[in-house]
């Protein structure tokens, strides 16, 4: 079974760069306190690094 991580949006996407808003949508996050469980891949890790100031990650 693939390793998964939980990603929670903790800051608003209002007044953020359009690229960062698109990254949040790509991760499946829509609003504050929304949590999604994703497969831990290099692509997902890269997306998380880009918006790390808006999300919380749980292994």
From Swiss-Prot:
Entry keyword Transcription regulation: no
Record has Cytoplasm as a keyword: no
UniProt-recorded Gene Ontology molecular function terms: structural constituent of ribosome
GO cellular component annotations of the record: cytosolic large ribosomal subunit
Record-stated family: Belongs to the universal ribosomal protein uL30 family.
Oligomeric form and interacting partners: Part of the 50S ribosomal subunit.
Name this protein carries in UniProt: Large ribosomal subunit protein uL30
Organism: Haemophilus influenzae (strain ATCC 51907 / DSM 11121 / KW20 / Rd)
Protein encoded by which gene: rpmD
